[in-house]
């Protein structure tokens, strides 16, 4: 990264529901957007454990790190811009993992003039309850990571309807850490 130029950290997340099936659409979308994202998080790549992808999922200008799934759906991937240095945080991947219920992938991006940034992509399968996710996984994870005094960017599909006020148990958990949940349209609605 050229430290003399102004740099904005710009993440993007997409639930792609099979990267093999939608890889061309992803590349077309990135071409249309014509933006240089710092990190692109992809959930539901459907990369299976013990079965390497059968296609080249490289995107020019990015390095990839991923966590496969042992389910028919799921799996997460981070594309990190080649303009950034980073290192995988597999120790954090393990904290947010439950067989066929939850997958995550994390990387840490070091900066010379500000705190490092931990960026992760999380996929919570619909079968895991919101309470189990927040109490058993998200809350302990956030408590641990907040002690590192680094910026945190969490991307992903938590399968929580943020418009349903009965499911907002995670919002008070995020607020003290200055994390803000965002809601955007799903690819299913855009197809």
Question: How should each PLM-predicted stretch be described?
Answer:
Residues 1-191:
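A shared catalytic/ligand-binding motif for oxyanion handling
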């Amino acid at each position: 990264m050229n430290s003399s130029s102004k740099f904005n950290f710009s993440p993007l997340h997409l639930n792609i529901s099979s990267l093999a099936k939608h890889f061309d659409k992803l590349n077309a979308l990135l071409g249309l957007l014509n933006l240089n994202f710092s990190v692109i998080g992809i959930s539901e790549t459907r990369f299976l454990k013990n079965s390497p992808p059968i296609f080249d999922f490289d995107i020019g200008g990015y390095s990839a790190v991923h966590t496969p799934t042992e389910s028919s759906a799921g799996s997460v991937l981070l594309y990190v811009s080649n303009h950034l240095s980073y290192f995988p945080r597999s120790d954090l991947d393990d904290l947010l993992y439950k067989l066929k219920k939850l997958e995550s992938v994390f990387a840490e991006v070091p900066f010379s003039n500000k705190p490092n940034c931990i960026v992760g992509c999380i996929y919570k399968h619909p079968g895991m309850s919101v309470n189990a996710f927040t109490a058993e996984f998200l809350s302990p994870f956030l408590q641990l990571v907040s002690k590192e005094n680094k910026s945190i960017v969490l991307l992903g599909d938590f399968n929580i309807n943020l418009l349903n006020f009965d499911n907002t148990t995670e919002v008070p958990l995020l607020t003290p850490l200055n994390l803000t949940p965002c809601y955007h349209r799903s690819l299913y609605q855009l197809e």
